[in-house]
Protein backbone atom coordinates (compact mmCIF):
# COMPACT_ATOMS: atom_id res chain seq x y z
CA UNK A 1 0.00 0.00 0.00
CA UNK A 2 1.28 3.45 -0.85
CA UNK A 3 0.14 6.71 0.72
CA UNK A 4 1.12 9.90 -1.05
CA UNK A 5 1.34 13.30 0.62
CA UNK A 6 1.15 16.36 -1.59
CA UNK A 7 3.09 19.37 -0.38
CA UNK A 8 2.12 22.39 -2.45
CA UNK A 9 4.75 24.99 -2.96
CA UNK A 10 3.61 28.45 -1.89
CA UNK A 11 2.74 30.96 -4.56
CA UNK A 12 3.90 34.57 -4.36
CA UNK A 13 1.53 35.61 -1.53
CA UNK A 14 1.74 32.50 0.67
CA UNK A 15 4.15 32.49 3.60
CA UNK A 16 6.78 29.73 3.70
CA UNK A 17 5.52 26.95 5.97
CA UNK A 18 8.67 24.83 6.00
CA UNK A 19 9.75 21.63 4.37
CA UNK A 20 7.52 18.58 4.47
CA UNK A 21 8.99 16.25 7.08
CA UNK A 22 9.43 12.73 5.75
CA UNK A 23 9.88 9.56 7.76
CA UNK A 24 9.30 5.88 7.27
CA UNK A 25 7.88 3.27 9.61
CA UNK A 26 8.47 -0.43 9.28
CA UNK A 27 7.87 -3.53 11.36
CA UNK A 28 9.12 -7.04 11.13
CA UNK A 29 6.48 -9.71 10.66
CA UNK A 30 8.41 -12.70 12.01
CA UNK A 31 6.81 -14.17 15.09
CA UNK A 32 8.81 -14.93 18.21
CA UNK A 33 9.07 -18.71 18.59
CA UNK A 34 10.39 -20.38 21.72
CA UNK A 35 11.95 -23.83 21.85
CA UNK A 36 11.40 -26.38 24.65
CA UNK A 37 13.93 -24.60 26.87
CA UNK A 38 12.19 -21.22 26.28
CA UNK A 39 15.00 -19.92 24.07
CA UNK A 40 14.05 -17.78 21.07
CA UNK A 41 14.42 -19.64 17.77
CA UNK A 42 15.92 -17.70 14.86
CA UNK A 43 14.92 -19.62 11.74
CA UNK A 44 16.04 -18.85 8.18
CA UNK A 45 12.97 -16.72 7.41
CA UNK A 46 13.49 -14.60 10.53
CA UNK A 47 17.18 -14.17 9.75
CA UNK A 48 16.33 -13.13 6.19
CA UNK A 49 13.82 -10.56 7.42
CA UNK A 50 16.23 -9.13 10.00
CA UNK A 51 18.96 -8.97 7.34
CA UNK A 52 16.56 -7.03 5.12
CA UNK A 53 15.84 -4.67 8.03
CA UNK A 54 19.58 -4.04 8.46
CA UNK A 55 19.94 -3.44 4.71
CA UNK A 56 17.11 -0.87 4.73
CA UNK A 57 18.32 0.92 7.85
CA UNK A 58 21.82 1.18 6.37
CA UNK A 59 20.60 2.38 2.97
CA UNK A 60 17.97 5.03 3.64
CA UNK A 61 18.79 8.66 4.36
CA UNK A 62 15.48 9.50 6.06
CA UNK A 63 14.47 8.59 9.61
CA UNK A 64 12.97 5.12 10.02
CA UNK A 65 10.89 4.05 13.00
CA UNK A 66 11.51 0.31 13.26
CA UNK A 67 9.31 -1.98 15.32
CA UNK A 68 11.14 -5.24 16.03
CA UNK A 69 10.37 -7.68 18.85
CA UNK A 70 13.09 -7.15 21.47
CA UNK A 71 13.33 -10.92 21.99
CA UNK A 72 14.55 -11.33 18.39
CA UNK A 73 17.27 -8.70 18.79
CA UNK A 74 18.30 -10.20 22.13
CA UNK A 75 18.51 -13.67 20.54
CA UNK A 76 20.74 -12.23 17.80
CA UNK A 77 23.01 -10.63 20.40
CA UNK A 78 23.35 -13.96 22.24
CA UNK A 79 23.62 -16.09 19.10
CA UNK A 80 26.43 -17.39 16.94
CA UNK A 81 28.95 -15.21 15.11
CA UNK A 82 26.65 -14.60 12.12
CA UNK A 83 23.74 -13.64 14.37
CA UNK A 84 25.87 -11.33 16.51
CA UNK A 85 27.23 -9.67 13.38
CA UNK A 86 23.67 -9.04 12.16
CA UNK A 87 22.69 -7.58 15.53
CA UNK A 88 25.75 -5.32 15.36
CA UNK A 89 24.68 -4.11 11.90
CA UNK A 90 21.17 -3.32 13.15
CA UNK A 91 22.52 -1.53 16.24
CA UNK A 92 25.00 0.50 14.19
CA UNK A 93 22.28 1.45 11.71
CA UNK A 94 19.91 2.54 14.48
CA UNK A 95 22.66 4.79 15.83
CA UNK A 96 24.07 6.12 12.55
CA UNK A 97 22.89 9.71 13.02
CA UNK A 98 20.06 9.59 10.48
CA UNK A 99 17.44 9.66 13.23
CA UNK A 100 16.22 6.06 13.19
CA UNK A 101 14.11 4.96 16.16
CA UNK A 102 13.39 1.60 17.74
CA UNK A 103 9.74 1.44 18.79
CA UNK A 104 8.80 -0.07 22.15
CA UNK A 105 7.35 -3.56 22.34
CA UNK A 106 6.98 -6.02 25.22
CA UNK A 107 9.91 -8.38 25.82
CA UNK A 108 7.73 -11.26 24.59
CA UNK A 109 4.64 -10.92 22.42
CA UNK A 110 1.64 -9.80 24.45
CA UNK A 111 -1.28 -8.15 22.69
CA UNK A 112 -2.44 -4.98 24.48
CA UNK A 113 -6.11 -5.77 23.75
CA UNK A 114 -5.76 -9.24 25.26
CA UNK A 115 -3.88 -7.90 28.27
CA UNK A 116 -6.51 -5.22 28.87
CA UNK A 117 -9.41 -7.67 28.51
CA UNK A 118 -7.76 -10.13 30.93
CA UNK A 119 -6.99 -7.42 33.49
CA UNK A 120 -3.25 -7.98 32.98
CA UNK A 121 -2.25 -4.36 32.47
CA UNK A 122 0.46 -4.64 35.15
CA UNK A 123 1.97 -7.65 33.37
CA UNK A 124 1.84 -5.81 30.05
CA UNK A 125 3.54 -2.79 31.61
CA UNK A 126 6.25 -4.98 33.15
CA UNK A 127 6.91 -6.79 29.87
CA UNK A 128 6.94 -3.48 27.98
CA UNK A 129 9.60 -2.10 30.34
CA UNK A 130 11.55 -5.34 30.04
CA UNK A 131 11.37 -5.03 26.24
CA UNK A 132 12.63 -1.46 26.41
CA UNK A 133 15.51 -2.62 28.60
CA UNK A 134 16.35 -5.36 26.08
CA UNK A 135 16.31 -2.84 23.24
CA UNK A 136 18.56 -0.46 25.17
CA UNK A 137 20.98 -3.27 26.02
CA UNK A 138 21.15 -4.82 22.57
CA UNK A 139 20.98 -1.72 20.36
CA UNK A 140 22.45 1.00 22.61
CA UNK A 141 19.45 3.16 21.75
CA UNK A 142 16.40 3.99 23.80
CA UNK A 143 13.03 2.76 22.64
CA UNK A 144 10.36 5.21 21.57
CA UNK A 145 7.02 4.61 23.25
CA UNK A 146 5.10 7.44 21.60
CA UNK A 147 4.38 5.59 18.34
CA UNK A 148 3.04 2.08 17.82
CA UNK A 149 2.49 0.24 14.56
CA UNK A 150 -0.78 -1.71 14.80
CA UNK A 151 -0.99 -4.49 12.16
CA UNK A 152 -4.19 -6.08 13.50
CA UNK A 153 -7.38 -5.07 15.27
CA UNK A 154 -7.04 -3.28 18.58
CA UNK A 155 -9.77 -2.91 21.17
CA UNK A 156 -10.65 0.29 22.99
CA UNK A 157 -9.13 -1.24 26.11
CA UNK A 158 -5.91 -2.05 24.26
CA UNK A 159 -5.70 1.45 22.78
CA UNK A 160 -6.41 2.95 26.21
CA UNK A 161 -3.64 0.82 27.75
CA UNK A 162 -1.15 2.01 25.13
CA UNK A 163 -2.29 5.61 25.62
CA UNK A 164 -1.85 5.33 29.39
CA UNK A 165 1.68 4.01 28.82
CA UNK A 166 2.67 6.97 26.64
CA UNK A 167 1.65 6.06 23.10
CA UNK A 168 0.40 9.12 21.23
CA UNK A 169 0.24 7.83 17.66
CA UNK A 170 -1.19 4.54 16.40
CA UNK A 171 -0.20 3.74 12.82
CA UNK A 172 -2.43 1.12 11.23
CA UNK A 173 -3.37 -0.10 7.78
CA UNK A 174 -6.70 0.90 6.26
CA UNK A 175 -7.98 -2.65 6.76
CA UNK A 176 -7.82 -2.20 10.54
CA UNK A 177 -9.67 1.10 10.91
CA UNK A 178 -11.86 1.21 7.78
CA UNK A 179 -14.85 -1.03 8.53
What are these regions (language model features)?
Residues 103, 169-172:
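Short hydrophobic alpha-helical runs that function as membrane-insertion/retention elements
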Residues 171-179:
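C-terminal active-site subregion of NodB/CE4 polysaccharide deacetylases
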Residues 2-93:
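Active-site beta->alpha N-cap acidic-glycine motif
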Residues 60-151, 157-158, 164-165, 177-178:
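Metal-dependent polysaccharide deacetylase catalytic core of the NodB/CE4 family, i.e.
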Residues 11-12, 52-53, 133-136, 159:
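Generic recognition of flexible, low-complexity loop/linker segments
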